[in-house]
């Protein structure tokens, strides 16, 4: 099967959408289109997301949750996929905090990352976590099979582990900053503001399994009454 050659149209102007949903607290989600899985820039943006919002030591968590106490939670990550990836920042406001306050704080931290990139210590911590995650996934035979299948599916070869690790080893603070400046521009994002209210967007429908034509036999078939021959 030939690999699909699909060009995803870029977002050239910021798009904003406000939706109501059955949620308790307002939330904001920012999304950017980024390079596909394993292509140039994917690993850099993976590290960008880890430093910006990949856990309690990340910049956004330290600023929004700990210092300013304006967010219940905040995350940032590179969602790697085959045709195009999505870099996403999501934050849930604390009671009494507006989405405008959240967006302003996120934009400030994002601007700092885009200007100077991560520190070497931040990058090393993110790199170690990413590589450790790959290694942990290889501790079981099922994990090895999944990893080999993933490489074969996306790249056409199962023999990619060493090169996958090398992707992260080759990332530098400068390459992370450059990838962010190229792909995470304000004009290239979709901003969704979620506020409590009636649900206006339905969930993606899930197909129901077909009903099987099962015949229930209440009596044993005739052949069971005949003992097997020698």
Q: What is each residue range found by the language model?
A:
Residues 42-43:
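Zinc-dependent metallopeptidase catalytic helix centered on the HExxH motif
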Residues 107-118:
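A common structural junction motif
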Residues 1-39, 50-100, 121-132, 143-147, ...:
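Non-catalytic beta-strand/loop surface segments
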Residues 95, 102, 110, 196:
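Substrate/cofactor-recognition hotspot
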Residues 194-230:
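Extracellular/periplasmic ectodomains of large secreted or surface enzymes and adhesion receptors
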Residues 114, 156-162, 178-180:
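C-terminal soluble interaction/assembly domains
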Residues 139, 147-149, 185-208:
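Detector for C-terminal structural segments
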């Amino acid at each position: 099967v030939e690999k699909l050659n699909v060009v995803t149209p870029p977002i050239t102007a910021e798009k904003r959408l406000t939706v109501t949903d059955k949620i308790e607290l307002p939330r904001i989600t920012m999304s950017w289109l980024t390079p596909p899985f394993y292509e140039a820039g994917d690993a850099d943006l993976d590290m960008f997301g880890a430093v910006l919002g990949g856990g309690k030591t990340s910049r956004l968590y330290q600023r929004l949750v700990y210092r300013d106490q304006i967010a219940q939670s905040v995350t940032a990550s590179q969602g790697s996929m085959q045709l195009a990836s999505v870099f996403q920042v999501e934050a849930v406001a604390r009671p009494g905090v507006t989405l405008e306050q959240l967006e302003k704080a996120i934009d400030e931290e994002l601007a700092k990352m885009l200007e100077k990139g991560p520190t070497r210590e931040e990058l090393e911590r993110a790199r170690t976590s990413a590589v450790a995650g790959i290694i942990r996934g290889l501790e079981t035979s099922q994990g090895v099979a999944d990893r080999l299948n993933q490489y074969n599916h996306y790249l056409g070869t199962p023999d990619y582990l060493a090169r996958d690790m090398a992707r992260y080893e080759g990332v530098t603070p400068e390459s992370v900053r450059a990838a962010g400046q190229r792909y995470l521009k304000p004009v290239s994002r979709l901003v969704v503001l979620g506020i409590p209210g009636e649900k206006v967007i339905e969930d993606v429908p899930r197909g129901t399994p077909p009903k099987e034509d099962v015949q229930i036999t209440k009596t044993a078939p005739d052949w069971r009454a005949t003992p097997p021959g020698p």
